Amino acid sequence: RSTLMRSSAASDVYKRQSEAELKKRRAAVTEQNKLYDSITEFIRPQLCDLENILKNIENNSGDISVNYAGACVVNVYIKRISNLLIMAKSRKMLNAFELENSIRELAEYISVYGISCSFFSNVSGEISAEKTIALFKFIGIFIRHIMNCTDALLFNLKVHDRFIDLKINCDSKNEMKIPDDLLDDITKLGGNVTTEYDADTLFVFVRMQSGGDDI
């Protein structure tokens, strides 16, 4: 009888452990699905852009090589911003190289698209994950606005002494207004955006502290 009782008790313990493990796994899957849903919502404009480009390719609309190159630019942005969002889920601070490498890869594919694009950088230390995402989103949406109306683009990123300085030079026949909601993403994190337009060139300057507790 005592053997049966011990066996029953062991079975109950195993059952409780299994139920607890199952609940933990379900919670992890639910949390992961929430993260993927939030990422999908974050990149929805770019997903729409990509879908439109692929439709153009399917319908033989426009230059096919330009369409493919444009799809690559959008795809790289989606990949990089998604990676940053995933990393930000578990880390408040990210190595500055994450932002640097994201911009560099994007610049490479912009050049493939046919825009003369240069990227210079000098970075060290860490940047708050929230600001890393805000800055790369700023660049992504900026590119989305100017891709079809510029021939040359230059990015200069400097992260030093607790500050982030991003400079963008863009050949443009018309002065471009930075969307207010894009400015808000930077200013609400304590950053500052200024623009100048001179001799068919748009100059954009973004400055903010690199830490996450200066707001």
What spans do the regions from the language model cover?
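Conserved short strand/loop->alpha-helix "switch" segment adjacent to the catalytic nucleotide/phosphoryl-transfer site
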Residues: 24, 28-34, 114-143, 161-164
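Short C-terminal beta-strand
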Residues: 201-211
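Conserved ATP-binding N-box helix of the HATPase_c
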Residues: 46, 53, 128-156, 182
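ATP phosphate-binding glycine-rich loop and adjacent ATP-lid/helix-beta elements
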Residues: 174-203
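Conserved DxG motif in ATP/Mg2+-binding regions
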Residues: 164-173
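Single conserved hydrophobic/aromatic residue that forms the stacking wall/gate
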Residues: 2-10, 14
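Conserved HAMP-HisKA connector
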Residues: 15-55
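Conserved DHp (HisKA) dimerization/phosphotransfer helix of two-component histidine kinases, i.e.
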Residues: 41-122
